[in-house]
């Protein structure tokens, strides 16, 4: 009986601690680390809806207003372009009032990513690329 009580108590403690630990990890994650996680998630995504939670609310709203067939086509084009980029290197992270601006580089291109904080979590607001 004591063992059952201990197991239940441990389970309760762990269930209460897990969300707190996740929030701590999110709070200590840098904008660069978030962006790298975003790129990995994007590479694995099968549809744009898979990455919408990582996008800023304004960008999510634009995507959600786009007709489903156009969204699918745009996502396919983005997948091709990001795959062609290969590995992206973050050269610099600059703090801003709303989050951070990342200076990026990949083979043949330079880019920037605007990462903002929404509800205490990092979100991708904008990303742009130009040829070197």
Question: Where do the model's predicted regions map?
Answer:
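Ser/Thr- and Asn-enriched, surface-exposed coil loops between beta-strands
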Residues: 94-98
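Bacterial N-terminal signal peptides that target proteins for export
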Residues: 1-9
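Short solvent-exposed beta->alpha transition segments
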Residues: 29-33, 37-44, 48-93
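N-terminal signal peptide c-region/cleavage motif recognized by signal peptidases
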Residues: 17-19
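Short beta-strand segments that buttress and anchor functional surface loops
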Residues: 100-107
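Short beta-strand edge/turn micro-motifs at domain boundaries
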Residues: 110-132
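Boundary of Sec targeting at the N-terminus
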Residues: 23-26
